[in-house]
Protein backbone atom coordinates (compact mmCIF):
# COMPACT_ATOMS: atom_id res chain seq x y z
CA UNK A 1 0.00 0.00 0.00
CA UNK A 2 1.07 3.57 -0.57
CA UNK A 3 0.05 7.01 0.66
CA UNK A 4 -1.89 7.45 3.86
CA UNK A 5 -2.14 10.63 5.84
CA UNK A 6 -4.09 11.96 8.75
CA UNK A 7 -4.61 15.24 6.99
CA UNK A 8 -5.98 16.66 3.79
CA UNK A 9 -4.23 18.38 0.92
CA UNK A 10 -6.24 20.80 -1.23
CA UNK A 11 -9.42 19.54 0.41
CA UNK A 12 -8.89 15.96 -0.77
CA UNK A 13 -8.29 13.16 1.67
CA UNK A 14 -5.63 10.77 0.45
CA UNK A 15 -6.09 7.04 0.77
CA UNK A 16 -4.18 3.79 0.51
CA UNK A 17 -3.33 2.72 -3.03
CA UNK A 18 -2.03 -0.55 -4.34
CA UNK A 19 1.44 0.21 -5.67
CA UNK A 20 3.54 -1.79 -8.09
CA UNK A 21 7.03 -1.35 -6.67
CA UNK A 22 8.56 -3.09 -9.69
CA UNK A 23 7.65 -0.07 -11.86
CA UNK A 24 10.35 2.04 -10.24
CA UNK A 25 13.34 1.06 -8.13
CA UNK A 26 15.13 4.10 -6.66
CA UNK A 27 18.89 4.15 -6.28
CA UNK A 28 18.49 5.59 -2.78
CA UNK A 29 15.70 5.59 -0.22
CA UNK A 30 16.04 8.13 2.59
CA UNK A 31 14.12 7.25 5.75
CA UNK A 32 13.66 10.15 8.17
CA UNK A 33 11.55 8.47 10.81
CA UNK A 34 11.38 8.71 14.58
CA UNK A 35 10.91 12.36 15.50
CA UNK A 36 7.42 11.98 16.95
CA UNK A 37 8.18 8.53 18.36
CA UNK A 38 10.32 10.19 21.00
CA UNK A 39 7.14 11.50 22.65
CA UNK A 40 6.16 7.84 23.14
CA UNK A 41 9.51 6.29 24.10
CA UNK A 42 10.70 9.12 26.40
CA UNK A 43 13.93 7.24 27.08
CA UNK A 44 12.11 4.16 28.44
CA UNK A 45 14.30 1.13 27.59
CA UNK A 46 11.35 -1.18 26.83
CA UNK A 47 9.67 1.38 24.59
CA UNK A 48 12.97 2.12 22.82
CA UNK A 49 13.40 -1.63 22.21
CA UNK A 50 9.86 -1.74 20.81
CA UNK A 51 10.70 1.17 18.50
CA UNK A 52 13.92 -0.53 17.38
CA UNK A 53 12.10 -3.79 16.63
CA UNK A 54 9.51 -1.91 14.57
CA UNK A 55 12.28 -0.06 12.74
CA UNK A 56 14.06 -3.33 11.90
CA UNK A 57 10.80 -4.75 10.54
CA UNK A 58 10.22 -1.58 8.52
CA UNK A 59 13.68 -1.89 6.97
CA UNK A 60 12.89 -5.50 6.05
CA UNK A 61 9.68 -4.33 4.36
CA UNK A 62 11.55 -1.62 2.44
CA UNK A 63 14.20 -4.11 1.33
CA UNK A 64 11.58 -6.68 0.24
CA UNK A 65 10.07 -4.11 -2.11
CA UNK A 66 13.34 -2.46 -3.16
CA UNK A 67 15.97 -5.21 -3.39
CA UNK A 68 18.73 -3.11 -5.01
CA UNK A 69 18.27 0.32 -3.43
CA UNK A 70 20.65 1.91 -0.98
CA UNK A 71 18.83 2.87 2.23
CA UNK A 72 19.92 5.87 4.30
CA UNK A 73 18.34 6.14 7.76
CA UNK A 74 18.34 9.68 9.13
CA UNK A 75 17.06 11.63 12.11
CA UNK A 76 17.86 14.79 13.96
CA UNK A 77 16.58 18.03 12.50
CA UNK A 78 13.79 18.22 15.11
CA UNK A 79 15.64 16.32 17.82
CA UNK A 80 18.18 13.55 18.09
CA UNK A 81 16.94 11.64 21.12
CA UNK A 82 16.11 8.45 19.19
CA UNK A 83 19.17 8.48 16.94
CA UNK A 84 20.96 5.88 19.12
CA UNK A 85 17.92 3.60 18.76
CA UNK A 86 18.04 4.06 14.99
CA UNK A 87 21.72 3.14 14.83
CA UNK A 88 21.02 0.12 17.05
CA UNK A 89 18.11 -0.91 14.81
CA UNK A 90 20.24 -0.56 11.67
CA UNK A 91 23.04 -2.59 13.29
CA UNK A 92 20.54 -5.30 14.28
CA UNK A 93 19.02 -5.32 10.81
CA UNK A 94 22.43 -5.61 9.13
CA UNK A 95 23.49 -8.42 11.48
CA UNK A 96 20.24 -10.34 10.94
CA UNK A 97 20.17 -9.94 7.16
CA UNK A 98 23.77 -9.40 6.05
CA UNK A 99 22.51 -6.38 4.10
CA UNK A 100 25.39 -3.92 3.70
CA UNK A 101 23.41 -1.36 1.69
CA UNK A 102 21.96 0.43 4.73
CA UNK A 103 23.64 3.46 6.30
CA UNK A 104 22.81 6.07 8.95
CA UNK A 105 23.14 9.84 9.05
CA UNK A 106 22.43 12.26 11.91
CA UNK A 107 21.18 15.71 10.94
CA UNK A 108 22.14 18.74 13.00
CA UNK A 109 19.25 19.97 15.13
CA UNK A 110 17.54 22.99 13.57
CA UNK A 111 18.94 26.36 14.62
CA UNK A 112 15.65 27.94 15.64
CA UNK A 113 17.41 30.80 17.42
CA UNK A 114 18.72 32.12 14.10
CA UNK A 115 16.36 30.52 11.57
CA UNK A 116 13.03 30.53 13.38
CA UNK A 117 10.38 27.85 13.13
CA UNK A 118 7.70 26.97 10.65
CA UNK A 119 4.28 25.74 11.82
CA UNK A 120 4.19 23.79 15.11
CA UNK A 121 7.96 24.09 15.68
CA UNK A 122 8.78 22.39 12.40
CA UNK A 123 11.94 23.51 10.58
CA UNK A 124 11.78 26.83 8.78
CA UNK A 125 12.54 27.16 5.08
CA UNK A 126 16.10 28.19 5.96
CA UNK A 127 16.52 25.16 8.23
CA UNK A 128 15.11 22.91 5.49
CA UNK A 129 17.65 24.28 3.03
CA UNK A 130 20.46 23.75 5.53
CA UNK A 131 19.28 20.16 6.02
CA UNK A 132 19.18 19.64 2.24
CA UNK A 133 22.84 20.64 2.01
CA UNK A 134 23.74 18.41 4.97
CA UNK A 135 21.96 15.48 3.35
CA UNK A 136 23.59 16.17 -0.01
CA UNK A 137 27.02 16.21 1.64
CA UNK A 138 26.25 12.96 3.46
CA UNK A 139 25.10 11.24 0.26
CA UNK A 140 28.20 12.43 -1.56
CA UNK A 141 30.43 11.19 1.27
CA UNK A 142 28.73 7.84 1.90
CA UNK A 143 28.07 6.80 -1.69
CA UNK A 144 30.65 8.82 -3.62
CA UNK A 145 27.95 10.17 -5.90
CA UNK A 146 28.76 13.44 -7.62
CA UNK A 147 26.86 16.41 -6.33
CA UNK A 148 24.64 18.49 -8.55
CA UNK A 149 24.48 22.04 -7.27
CA UNK A 150 21.06 23.29 -6.30
CA UNK A 151 19.65 26.36 -7.97
CA UNK A 152 19.74 29.29 -5.56
CA UNK A 153 16.13 30.02 -4.72
CA UNK A 154 16.90 32.90 -2.36
CA UNK A 155 15.57 31.01 0.66
CA UNK A 156 18.78 31.69 2.57
CA UNK A 157 17.74 35.33 2.55
CA UNK A 158 14.55 34.59 4.47
CA UNK A 159 14.67 35.84 8.03
CA UNK A 160 13.17 34.49 11.20
CA UNK A 161 10.49 37.19 10.95
CA UNK A 162 9.53 36.04 7.47
CA UNK A 163 8.69 32.61 8.86
CA UNK A 164 6.71 34.14 11.73
CA UNK A 165 4.65 36.01 9.14
CA UNK A 166 4.17 32.78 7.21
CA UNK A 167 3.03 31.08 10.42
CA UNK A 168 0.42 33.77 10.99
CA UNK A 169 -0.97 33.33 7.46
CA UNK A 170 -1.14 29.55 7.90
CA UNK A 171 -2.78 29.84 11.32
CA UNK A 172 -5.35 32.33 10.00
CA UNK A 173 -6.23 30.14 7.02
CA UNK A 174 -6.57 26.99 9.13
CA UNK A 175 -8.83 28.76 11.65
CA UNK A 176 -11.16 29.78 8.80
CA UNK A 177 -11.93 26.13 7.94
Ranges and model annotations:
Residues 16, 54-58, 134:
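Well-ordered alpha-helical segments embedded in enzymatic catalytic cores
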Residues 27-32, 70-75, 103-106:
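Structural recognition of the beta-strand scaffold that forms the well-ordered cores
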Residues 1-49, 77-84, 118, 122:
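Conserved SGNH/GDSL esterase-like catalytic core that processes O-acyl groups on lipids
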Residues 50-69, 75, 89:
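Extracytoplasmic, non-cytosolic globular domains
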Residues 39, 77-154:
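Catalytic His-Asp segment of secreted/periplasmic serine-dependent ester chemistry enzymes
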Residues 66, 97-99, 161:
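Short, well-ordered coil/turn elements that cap or connect secondary structure elements
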Residues 15-24, 60-65, 95, 142-145:
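Surface-exposed acidic, glycine-flexible loop patches that form ligand/cofactor-binding
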Residues 151-177:
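Ser/Thr/Gly/Pro-rich low-complexity, disordered linker/stalk segments of secreted
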